[in-house]
């Protein structure tokens, strides 16, 4: 793993700092003065690769290791496109076992067989969030089932792993953007807590939690209000823990202010929601909802319902292209983590984080390109311990764009300036129509990676770590530098 090496830039070395391999050597002088980015203690790296030739045409600190933040989602997305067609979909199936009596009583259980689909019940899918539950309830009625002597079992065994990444920061775990990844993900694995706030330095009042989560306890004795108008509240709590604690502060004088956290057990939440929906529809369900994990912890095992039971309902996700488009445009960590697990699930019945990362590296080795030297702890880039070089990222992007295995679609799945997480970045630039970038940011980190499709097509990577000053100022420095580099390259054609 590469360590940070903050550098001081001395004029005599600038000629070697950033080079353009096209045209006259003096052309580099047009770009060099824009470095360093982010202050004297920052580490800055850039790599621009001509996709057709595979040659590096501009580089600076390109072989230094950086924290990529959310640009790491590009590795996950590119890997999925190497594995599956853009129209590939995930499938969640519902089975029942036992016999149905003449009076409509099912002497058995319903089983939701999960596959880790992040779009199930998601507010970002094109269907209503409760559509899955309503369709299963309709399928139960259509099968003539009026009562269930057992209950609803959520089979979350496809991902028998710690739902959250051990290398994530503790202050992130429990918040919506660090939601765990389960064998069954539902409703984006999140809830919303709404408060009202009064005078600064007073204690907010909890108005409610949506959706209601049975057993969830919310403690916030140290949550206060502030004058700044900023949301500085963090929710703490791990997977399967039904106690959530909130620290920090919320803006003062708000009738309603909402913060979001992650569900403690999404598979159980879905099974409970379906149980409630069936009961409201007049279908009696005897047992309370449970999951494969809970049964296993009680010393019980699931029957072979897939072989001995009956398929009741089949739900398909949006296409891979649609899910990746959302993942990259909105920088959705849950989608990225769930899709990473699909890499191993394509070759094995279950998936773990470590196994999925290793399978991802195997896929790239077999494709003739190695990412073995990268330090990867997740699929979303949320871990601050991830490390990759701009050169490695750029070569990967160029490789997948030339692969003909769906990689040529990747630029179309990326946001352009003015969209998603690029809403304000280079939005008014004349280069904007040709830029397709994924941003990545965390404390002291600002990165961009993707494609520029101007007179020629390039893979573009910029990484800045340990910057000082405001994020807006660093983003402007990056925008100015990219404008100079890409304009120079365009003018060479």
PLM feature spans:
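Bacterial N-terminal signal peptides that target proteins for export
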Residues: 2-13
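Bacterial N-terminal signal peptides
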Residues: 11-21
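Beta-lactamase-like hydrolase cores
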Residues: 26-65, 87-91, 134-144
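Conserved serine DD-peptidase/penicillin-binding transpeptidase domain
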Residues: 31-35, 82-371, 484-492
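Small-residue-rich helix-loop
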Residues: 57-59, 131, 337-493
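Short active-site loop at a secondary-structure junction
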Residues: 59-79
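A short glycine/serine-rich beta->alpha loop
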Residues: 61-66, 260, 380-383
């Amino acid at each position: 793993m590469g360590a940070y090496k903050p550098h001081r830039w001395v004029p005599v070395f600038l000629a070697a700092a950033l080079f353009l391999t096209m045209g006259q050597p003096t052309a580099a002088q047009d770009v060099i003065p824009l470095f360093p980015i982010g202050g004297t203690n920052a580490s800055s790296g850039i790599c621009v690769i001509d996709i057709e030739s595979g040659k590096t045409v501009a580089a600076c600190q390109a072989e230094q290791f950086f924290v990529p933040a959310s640009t790491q989602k590009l590795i996950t997305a590119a890997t999925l496109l190497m594995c599956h067609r853009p129209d590939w979909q995930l499938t969640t199936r519902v089975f029942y076992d036992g016999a149905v009596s003449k009076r409509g009583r099912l002497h058995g259980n319903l089983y939701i067989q999960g596959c880790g689909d992040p779009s199930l019940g998601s507010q970002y899918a094109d269907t209503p969030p409760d559509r899955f539950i309503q369709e299963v309830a309709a399928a139960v009625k259509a099968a003539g089932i009026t009562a269930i002597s057992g209950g609803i079992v959520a089979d979350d065994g496809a991902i028998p792993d710690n739902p959250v990444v051990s290398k994530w920061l503790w202050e992130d775990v429990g918040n919506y953007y660090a939601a765990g990844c389960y064998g069954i993900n539902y409703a984006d694995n999140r809830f919303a807590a709404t408060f009202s706030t009064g005078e600064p330095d007073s204690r907010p009042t909890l108005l409610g939690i949506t959706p209601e989560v049975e057993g969830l306890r919310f403690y916030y004795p140290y949550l206060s209000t502030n004058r700044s108008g900023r949301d500085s509240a963090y929710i703490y709590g791990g997977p399967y823990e039904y106690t959530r604690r909130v620290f920090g502060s919320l803006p003062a004088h708000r009738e309603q202010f909402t913060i979001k956290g992650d569900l403690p057990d999404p598979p159980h939440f879905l099974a409970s929601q379906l149980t409630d929906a069936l009961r409201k529809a007049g279908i009696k369900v005897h047992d309370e909802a449970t999951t494969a994990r809970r049964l296993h912890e009680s010393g019980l095992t699931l029957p072979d319902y897939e072989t001995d039971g009956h398929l009741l309902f089949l739900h398909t996700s949006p296409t891979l292209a649609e899910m990746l488009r959302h993942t990259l445009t909105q920088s959705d960590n849950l989608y990225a983590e769930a899709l990473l697990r699909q890499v191993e699930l394509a070759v094995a019945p279950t998936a773990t984080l470590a196994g999925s990362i290793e399978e991802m590296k195997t896929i790239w080795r077999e494709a003739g390109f190695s990412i073995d030297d990268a330090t990867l702890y997740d699929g979303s880039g949320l871990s601050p311990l991830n490390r990759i070089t701009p050169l490695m990222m750029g070569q990967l992007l160029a490789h997948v764009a030339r692969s003909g295995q769906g990689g040529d679609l990747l630029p179309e799945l990326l946001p352009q300036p003015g969209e998603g997480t690029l809403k304000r970045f280079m939005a008014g630039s004349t280069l904007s129509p040709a830029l397709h970038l994924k941003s990545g940011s965390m404390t002291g980190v600002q990165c961009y990676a993707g494609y520029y499709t101007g007179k020629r097509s390039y893979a573009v990577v910029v990484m800045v770590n340990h910057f000082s000053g405001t994020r807006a100022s660093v983003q402007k420095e990056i925008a100015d530098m990219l404008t100079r580099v890409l304009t120079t390259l365009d003018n060479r054609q």
